């Protein structure tokens, strides 16, 4: 009986540990996904690592082509609510055009656009302009965007990212 009791206790402890690890993993998943996207645009992953991480982290990047947009709030605003509001305005405008993944990188917000066709960029630019006008009018906060080139493969994202970051500096 003691042996069975120990085995049951061990089994219960293992199950509780698995549940605890699963809970920790789920809580840290958004951060892990963000780190993956940063590595992706910076070019620090092999194609095999890209595939494995997409699967492991449940990040869908299905698209015919991609483009990176970098955004920085130009006002020296410590008002977190205003910054959040600006980001939400941009998100809402972009959602009307195409799917995307947004993540923070240093003091910028990076948008990885998942495009069905390069022609969507015209609508993207219009959406960003409209979000800029809304932000200035309602939030009194301006932002700047840099847009990288369109690429067809995930491996080409670092070039688009570099261009978007450089464009933001002008």
Briefly describe each language-model feature range.
Residues 101-106, 133-145:
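Catalytic core regions of nucleotide second-messenger enzymes
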Residues 2-123, 151-152, 159-169:
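Interdomain helical linkers/hinges and coiled-coil/dimerization scaffolds
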Residues 141-143, 147-154, 170:
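Flexible, glycine/charge-rich interdomain/linker segments that couple
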Residues 123-139, 165:
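Alpha-helical scaffold within the catalytic cores of cyclic-nucleotide enzymes
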